[in-house]
């Protein structure tokens, strides 16, 4: 989904930085595990609080945990197990970009999310 028709990198970056929150949700897409891809029929979904993810890159590579918080403004997620100690000695969650995680368990309690999956599944099968 292009935010701008321009191919210029500066305009691409600007459109990402200036994107409204309702469009930033699309930037939170993360890949699904191969088992979930077969089960649900889609390749990626926006990450939500309650999903279980596996961190694929960075210092916390290999850590699996539930998503505790999603920061739309900064396009980052916070995962149980990915923590650090701040200067006050408190344990805080480390922000992780959603492209660096893989969803291993999806929270399907929301009917709107189930409709999204059905809609995307139809779109993928219709185009082939």
Curated annotation (Swiss-Prot):
Which segment of the chain is annotated as a signal peptide?
none
Membrane-spanning ranges: none
What the entry lists under InterPro entries is as follows: KOW, Rib_uL2_dom2, Ribosomal_uL24_CS, Ribosomal_uL24_euk/arc, Ribosomal_uL24_KOW, Translation_prot_SH3-like_sf
State the Gene Ontology terms under molecular function.
rRNA binding; structural constituent of ribosome
Q: Name one Pfam family in it.
A: KOW
Q: Which UniProt keywords apply?
A: Ribonucleoprotein, Ribosomal protein, RNA-binding, rRNA-binding
Subunit (UniProt): Part of the 50S ribosomal subunit.
According to its UniProt entry, the function of this protein is described as:
One of two assembly initiator proteins, it binds directly to the 5'-end of the 23S rRNA, where it nucleates assembly of the 50S subunit. Located at the polypeptide exit tunnel on the outside of the subunit.
Protein family (similarity comment): Belongs to the universal ribosomal protein uL24 family.
This one is known as Large ribosomal subunit protein uL24
Q: Which organism is it from?
A: Pyrobaculum calidifontis (strain DSM 21063 / JCM 11548 / VA1)
| Encoding gene, per UniProt annotation | rpl24
